[in-house]
Amino acid sequence: KARSPRETSLALLLCLPYNLGGFNLGTVELNRPIELENRYGEKITRIPDLTIQLKDKRQKRATVLLDYDPAVTHSGGQKITRDLDRENELVTGVQCPHFSVSGEMLKSFESVQGLVRQIRESTGITARDTTMSDLEERQRALWARLFKTR
């Protein structure tokens, strides 16, 4: 159900297990419809690019939504306004963190690491322990395969 290769790549990087170079955030659904009410009280459907279900070793669970930043992906004032309205509806209609990610952010491994930190901090779900000494190297290698510009 991915709408773009970038969505698939981001889902892989964030949710694959550590041994495959991912950040092991949890399970992911691409473009899962979410029913909510808009600011006028109307029932609407919004579709974030990624819906990630995180859980820790004590089975605490949290949900995070991710979208590409509309100001970066769409041009034109009306489209940007519509995209921002959609984002605001998600933030107020669903009781979970919502993050916007731009293509520019994905060009920096450190930026992706920062996004993962923000996701974990916003949910209170800590990273699972690992004994892998080369974890960052594996993550950097996967990121480079998926996002590094040639």
Model regions: which residues?
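Surface segments flanking catalytic/ligand-binding clefts of nucleic-acid enzymes
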Residues: 1-150
